[in-house]
């Protein structure tokens, strides 16, 4: 088989006829009307369900409209069709691409010019985008093959093998043609292995069958290369086409009929007639839509889309634009010469009172509202859709209601009139696809879905990620509060009642639109897509593996190299690599875990120096390596292609880098023998990033500056992802030798850095002559420099006996000295920051005050649990403020951290530490003397499931729900946070479980119940203890009991015993005169609270 042979395979000649996979049109005359009873009868509850034979309709501006998908939406400007003729090349910007399989018997009206590409079937790439003028475009690209490589066995007819395998692959099957040709390529894995013998390329015009046949060949033990690369990736890489950028279409034909898209201009062309325009980075105008839904549960529980009675009652939309030339493209009466102003739309069941600046569409039922919403989407045709948690809730909820309950064909409302798809995919835990992530994915043909919830969770550090919290952090705004329980009540209260619910629904969409523009993640994702040549949706949903893989694929394609299909690593290697990729220590595991996994592969993690736990009230300088892992790859020539493996030619030892890890040794050839391909990529990208950052300084256009900023960020993120790419066991191209070698080299670099700093900086002459410190800044008696922690890419050096201001001026010179003395380009040690006080808790956990800042810097520290009450958080915050900002308390804390337990028993705590103890005493007094408001003592937990589903019944928030039910009060729904307060009933025991004394805060206030002060004080002490644990004497047994030994005890006398206090005082005085007694009584009255008396012992 020495020539390229194309043959056809039709599975239906040997099997039953194929099923018709086309969806039925949604044109049922009868439909189910589900209407809240409150729409017809104000204040009524429940639903009305009837079968309707009328045409679906809506009302807008007191006019009735039939919901026909072919009729323009009344408030949107109709965009004209651009059907040509076009005489020039079409220049367009593409933002999304999808691959469709078109069969020869398809009813798609394809010109004879391109028809040969779909016989018997063909991959058709649909490129969505816009022209310079903002005209929406769909380019149908014909002729792109899907292909992979495999080694032919001796005397094998590869064509017959492919057909035999095609007969065995699982349904559904479809016709395909295959061409098989010999190729000369070498493997990317392993140095000097030469060309792969008997290597053939198998090219298919049917991607689905290509994937199934290749997978079966791999399962049979054949050597297969680059399996899983879809035709879109081949098109973008082989033709150098940007997945997000400008292109040129030549020799095309404009569709005159049989449109498959809703674009204004639809053209067909050959795969060879699309050219890239690389030099331009601006955006055309793209339409965006932010939306939110409001639901009403039929049972009062958290809504479930599968329940017929849990209906959607309102949908809010905000239409806006991104890119250049942003006009009122969605407004009928817009002046196109002015910038666009976001348009607000509200879809609601039943009439609604007017809301300023909002277009309100009213519908008789849920079905009609959903139908109207989809028709609106099809006419507005947004390129971007956003919202908050829409991947996990809103889109899934709408699709479930539309498809399962009302049997709607939602695909027809996408940008594709035929073959459009709209679905949500939730992979099972641990079962994500090849090179993908475990996140919920949304596919919407021709539209990019960008949920702001995962964006915020990735970018913000917050106790919670509610939209209200994110709006406060980024926008300095607060949501208008409307309880979930109030929405159904308001909705059923008539026209005027539905308006507040509509405003509440709309404000979420408005806030998300502002977050979308503020965080500008679409620019960042677009820059990554352009760099890696992957669709924008893969940047959003598929993690970092696919980005690096396609970059390597492109680099290898120009060097006659191919990527192997690597098997996943074993569990032991997986555990070690993933631990190291996260910056952990591979030779140490958490309590209760199997610690043998990492050792079985001789893998050692990146943490190299145990932390010196305690409080350091001296300058602590942090040094880290700039781009540590990329610089290790570049400086040591690490790569798949430089790794010496079995079959590699002999190389002189002087030209080999040996990385010894335990009893294993990984060997790589040096740069003079063969240049690392990974290093070449990194050098190119880092150079490009430097140029972009330089260009940013000269750029005056804000939009262009933002695009360049996201471009340099994309380059940085992609460079840093290389180490993780090699080290993820279930990744697309895992390589333990590279990942382990990077970690080992990094470990050695940190050890060398620590040794150099400690050796040189403890010499006064080095400090003066090399670092330029003045003699008066150095105290020779107290001089001591010590590395107190080393982690992944950072070292923490404590400097005793050196003036911190003078030291701050010299640390840059110290970093440069270490770099020049120990490392070669491009490795560079940099000074990051100086802590003036640092509390080292343990590995990866510390709190410190940075020089020049009033805020505390924390890592791996959650000071108090998220469920803690406000009072506990306030006390912990006060204690930390004293420890880090009060010089006296800081000195006392450092003294305490140096004491032994015997010192503590003999001398007590340092007097400078006394204010911390006093703050705890004051907290205890405030609790016992009822000075703390109930809201500050309120705890909360989420009701994550139905009450009956909990295996552990004795939880405080569950007990509160049972008490609410017993009093016949309103109950929380699943998903709500249940608030509670710990009370002190009569006869309450000291160690009573929390669930027995938990009560609803409103009931506590109304019934004037007593607070369980001791329980709250225990929480305060526990939180402060957990925070300050490193400063307690290390040899002290049961350090968690520290404050019970140093805080003075007090007895708080209940109200009913206060009248006895006077008699006790008289007996103690031994019958003094009445004047003294009156004075004592007067003092007692002054200190007495309304309920307790505190007596210190």
From Swiss-Prot:
Name the catalysed reactions. DNA(n) + a 2'-deoxyribonucleoside 5'-triphosphate = DNA(n+1) + diphosphate
Q: Where is the composition biased (Basic and acidic residues)?
A: 1078-1097
The UniProt GO MF terms for this protein read:
DNA binding; DNA-directed DNA polymerase activity; nucleotide binding
Question: What does the record give as EC number?
Answer: 2.7.7.7
| DNA-binding as UniProt keyword | yes
Q: Which UniProt keywords apply?
A: DNA replication, DNA-binding, DNA-directed DNA polymerase, Host nucleus, Nucleotidyltransferase, Transferase, Viral DNA replication
Which residues lie within the region annotated Disordered?
Answer: 1069-1097
Q: Check the record and name the InterPro entries matching this protein.
A: DNA-dir_DNA_pol_B (IPR006172), DNA-dir_DNA_pol_B_CS (IPR017964), DNA-dir_DNA_pol_B_exonuc (IPR006133), DNA-dir_DNA_pol_B_multi_dom (IPR006134), DNA/RNA_pol_sf (IPR043502), DNA_pol_B_thumb (IPR042087), DNA_pol_palm_dom_sf (IPR023211), DNA_pol_type-B (IPR050240)
> What GO cellular component is one of the record's annotations?
host cell nucleus
Please state where this protein is localized: Host nucleus
Q: Which enzyme class, named as a word? A: transferase
* Gene Ontology terms: biological process: DNA-templated DNA replication; viral DNA genome replication
Please state which protein family the record places this protein in: Belongs to the DNA polymerase type-B family.
In its UniProt entry, what is this protein called? Answer: DNA polymerase catalytic subunit
For this protein's source organism, the top of the classification is: Viruses, Duplodnaviria, Heunggongvirae, Peploviricota, Herviviricetes
């Amino acid at each position: 088989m020495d020539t390229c042979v194309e043959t056809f395979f039709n599975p239906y000649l040997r099997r039953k006829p194929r099923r018709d996979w086309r969806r039925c049109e949604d044109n049922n005359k009868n439909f189910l009307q589900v209407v809240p009873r409150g729409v017809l009868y104000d204040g009524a509850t429940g639903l009305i369900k009837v079968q309707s034979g009328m045409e679906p309709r809506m009302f807008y501006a007191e006019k009735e409209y039939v919901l026909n998908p072919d009729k323009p939406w009344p408030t949107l400007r109709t965009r004209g069709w651009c059907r040509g003729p076009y005489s020039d090349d079409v220049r367009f910007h593409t933002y999304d691409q999808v691959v469709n399989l078109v069969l020869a018997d398809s009813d798609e009206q394809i010109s004879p010019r391109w028809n040969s590409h779909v016989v018997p079937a063909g991959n058709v790439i649909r490129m969505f985008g816009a022209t310079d003028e903002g005209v929406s475009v769909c380019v149908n690209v014909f002729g792109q093959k899907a292909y992979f490589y495999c080694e032919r066995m001796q005397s094998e007819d590869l064509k017959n093998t492919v057909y035999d395998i095609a007969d065995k692959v699982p349904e559904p099957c479809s016709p395909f043609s295959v061409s098989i040709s010999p190729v000369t390529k070498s493997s990317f894995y392993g140095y000097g292995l030469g060309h792969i013998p008997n290597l053939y390329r198998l090219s298919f015009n049917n991607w689905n069958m290509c994937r199934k046949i290749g997978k079966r060949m791999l399962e049979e033990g054949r050597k297969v290369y680059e399996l899983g690369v879809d035709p879109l990736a081949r098109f973008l890489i082989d033709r150098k086409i940007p997945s997000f950028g400008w292109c040129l279409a030549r020799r095309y034909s404009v569709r005159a009929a049989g449109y498959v898209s809703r674009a204004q201009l639809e053209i067909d062309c050959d795969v060879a007639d699309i050219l890239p325009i690389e030099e331009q980075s601006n955006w055309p105008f793209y339409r965006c839509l932010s939306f939110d839904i409001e639901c009403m549960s039929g049972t009062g529980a958290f809504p479930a889309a599968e329940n017929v009675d849990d209906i959607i009652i309102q949908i809010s939309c905000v239409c806006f634009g991104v890119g250049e030339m942003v006009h009122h493209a969605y407004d009928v009466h817009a002046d196109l010469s002015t910038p666009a102003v976001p348009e607000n739309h509200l879809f609601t069941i039943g009439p609604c009172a007017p809301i300023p600046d909002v277009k309100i569409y009213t519908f008789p039922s849920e079905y009609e509202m959903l139908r109207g919403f989809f028709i609106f989407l099809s006419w507005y045709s947004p390129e971007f859709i956003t919202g908050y948690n829409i991947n996990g809730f809103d889109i899934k909820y709408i699709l479930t209601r539309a498809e399962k309950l009302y049997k709607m064909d939602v695909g027809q409302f996408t940008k594709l009139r035929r073959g459009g798809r709209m679905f949500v995919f939730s992979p099972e835990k641990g079962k994500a696809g090849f090179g993908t992530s475990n996140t919920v994915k949304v596919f919407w043909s021709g539209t990019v879905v960008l949920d702001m919830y995962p964006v915020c969770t990735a970018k913000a550090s917050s106790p919670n990620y509610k939209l209200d919290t994110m709006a406060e952090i980024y926008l300095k705004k607060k949501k208008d509060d409307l309880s979930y329980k109030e929405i159904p009540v308001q909705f059923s209260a008539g026209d005027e009642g539905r308006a507040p619910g509509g405003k509440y629904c709309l404000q979420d969409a408005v806030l998300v639109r502002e977050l979308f523009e503020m965080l500008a993640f679409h620019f960042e994702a677009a820059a990554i897509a352009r760099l890696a040549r992957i669709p924008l949706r893969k940047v959003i949903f598929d993690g970092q593996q696919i980005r690096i893989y396609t970059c390597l694929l492109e680099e290898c394609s120009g060097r006659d190299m191919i990527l192997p299909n690597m098997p996943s690593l074993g569990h032991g290697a997986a555990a070690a690599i993933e631990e190291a990729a996260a910056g952990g220590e591979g030779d140490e595991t958490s309590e209760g875990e199997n610690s043998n996994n990492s050792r079985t592969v001789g893998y050692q993690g990146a943490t190299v120096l145990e932390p010196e736990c305690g409080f350091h009230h001296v300058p602590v300088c942090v040094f880290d390596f700039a781009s540590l892992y990329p610089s290790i790859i570049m400086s040591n020539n690490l790569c798949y292609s430089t790794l010496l493996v079995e079959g590699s030619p002999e190389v002189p030892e002087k030209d080999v880098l040996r990385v010894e890890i335990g009893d294993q040794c990984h060997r790589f050839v040096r740069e003079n023998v063969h240049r690392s391909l990974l290093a070449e990529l990194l050098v190119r990208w880092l150079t490009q990033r430097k140029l972009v950052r330089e260009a940013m300084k000269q750029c005056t256009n804000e939009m262009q500056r933002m695009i360049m900023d996201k471009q340099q960020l994309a380059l940085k993120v992609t460079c840093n992802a290389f180490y993780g790419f090699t080290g993820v066991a279930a990744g697309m191209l895992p390589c333990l030798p590279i990942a382990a070698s990077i970690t080992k080299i990094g470990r050695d670099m940190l050890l060398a850095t620590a040794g150099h700093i400690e050796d040189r900086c403890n010499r006064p002459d080095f400090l003066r002559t090399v670092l330029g410190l003045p003699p008066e800044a150095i105290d020779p008696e107290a001089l001591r420099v010590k590395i107190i922690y080393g982690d992944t890419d950072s070292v923490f050096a404590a400097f005793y006996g050196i003036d911190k201001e003078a030291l701050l001026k010299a640390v840059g010179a110290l970093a440069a000295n270490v770099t020049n003395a120990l490392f070669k380009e491009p490795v560079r040690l940099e000074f990051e920051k100086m802590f003036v006080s640092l509390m080292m808790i343990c590995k990866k956990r510390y709190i410190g005050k940075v020089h020049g800042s009033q805020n505390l810097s924390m890592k791996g520290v959650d000071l108090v649990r998220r469920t803690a009450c406000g009072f506990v958080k306030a006390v912990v915050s006060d204690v930390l403020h004293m420890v880090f900002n009060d010089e006296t308390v800081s000195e006392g804390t450092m003294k305490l951290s140096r004491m032994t337990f015997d010192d503590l028993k003999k001398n007590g705590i340092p007097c400078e530490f006394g204010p911390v103890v006093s703050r705890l005493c004051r907290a205890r007094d405030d609790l016992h003397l009822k000075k703390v408001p109930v809201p500050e003592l309120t705890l909360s937990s989420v009701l994550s499931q139905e009450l009956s589903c909990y295996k552990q019944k004795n939880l405080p928030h569950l007990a509160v729900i049972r008490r609410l039910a017993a009093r016949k009060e309103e109950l929380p729904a699943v998903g709500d946070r249940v608030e509670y307060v710990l009370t002190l009933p009569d006869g309450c025991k000291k160690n009573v479980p929390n669930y027995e004394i938990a009560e609803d805060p409103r009931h506590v206030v109304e019934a004037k119940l007593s607070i369980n002060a001791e329980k709250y004080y225990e929480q305060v002490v526990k939180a402060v203890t957990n925070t300050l644990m490193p400063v307690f004497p290390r040899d002290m047994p049961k350090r968690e009991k520290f404050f019970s030994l140093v805080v003075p005890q007090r007895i708080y006398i209940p109200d009913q015993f206060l009248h006895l206090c006077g008699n006790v005082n008289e007996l103690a005085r031994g019958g003094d005169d009445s004047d003294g007694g009156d004075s004592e009584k007067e003092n007692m009255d002054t200190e007495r609270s309304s309920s307790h008396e505190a007596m210190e012992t």
